[in-house]
């Protein structure tokens, strides 16, 4: 089971909602098969951590390169993001 709910907006654009009640261990290191851009729809204290980097706030647009390991670090409240897959 995925740790988010997803709504498809177009072929490459999605809204994802990560629930605050999801256990932190569900947010595992992973990599994606395409470049992506994420942007939080609402202010948040959730963070994203890329391989070999310190966690950073999800502010503005965040580029996630294809095949780079990354993970979310849970904050307070739900996280609602706009996700664009650069395919």
Residue ranges and their predicted role:
Residues 1-18:
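Transition segment at domain starts
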Residues 65-87:
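Ligand-binding loop in jelly-roll beta-barrel domains
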Residues 50-69:
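Short acidic-glycine-tyrosine-enriched beta hairpin
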Residues 31-46:
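Short, conserved beta-strand element in jelly-roll/cupin
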Residues 13-32, 63-67:
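Conserved short histidine dyad/triad with adjacent acidic residue
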Residues 41, 48-49, 73, 82:
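Beta-strand residues in well-ordered beta-sheet regions across diverse protein folds
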């Amino acid at each position: 089971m995925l740790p988010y709910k997803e709504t498809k907006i177009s072929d490459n654009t999605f809204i994802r909602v990560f629930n605050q009640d999801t256990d932190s261990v569900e947010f595992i290191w992973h990599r994606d098969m395409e470049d992506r851009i994420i942007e939080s729809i609402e202010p948040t204290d959730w963070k994203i951590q890329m391989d070999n980097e310190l966690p950073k706030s999800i502010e503005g647009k965040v580029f996630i390169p294809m095949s780079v390991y990354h993970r979310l670090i849970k904050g307070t409240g739900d996280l609602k993001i706009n996700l664009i897959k650069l395919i």
